[in-house]
Amino acid sequence: MKKITILAAAFLMTTVAFGQTTWKNDPMHSKLGFTITHLMVSDVDGIFKDFHCTIVASKPDFSDAKFQLTVNTTSINTDVDYRDKDLRSANYFDVANFPTMTFTSTGISAVSTNHYKLSGNLTLHGVTKPVTMDLWYRGTITNPMSKKDDAGFKLTGIIKRSDFNFAPQAGSTMLSDEITINANGEFGKAN
């Protein structure tokens, strides 16, 4: 009886594992950006050029998706070299001590068809806090070049600098507390 139970458990675990698909973002067709307000009168946009995101899901509508994101903070780019160098310094991202920023999803809930609230833990500047973002699943299509399935996603949300003790010296008049996150990603099957 014990052997049958162990075999049944192994079979169920294998079935569940094979039912899940892992997807990885295509760096050439993915973007992770942000907007922050400078002096409360002008928006500054930037991107991270080096990031990796995986999704694990078993449902075709991704309603059970789990996201894992790792961002290389040294890859920040605002199209102004002087500002980018300052943003990498201890005044802001402190990339020498915090070379990565991460997000691990903890839950996903449907808002409407293909629109979800994605919750998870964001680690920025050594501080981990729960955040919730809006996620849109934009569909899956067979890529005419690779002949493999690609899935598209769009994500938006707002985080607060103060929640992560990020650049407190900037105060609330130099930089807005709210940072808008905008991401678009094209993901291909990894398995």
Task: Annotate each PLM feature.
Residues 10-11, 95:
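Alpha-helix termination/capping residues and helix-transition junctions
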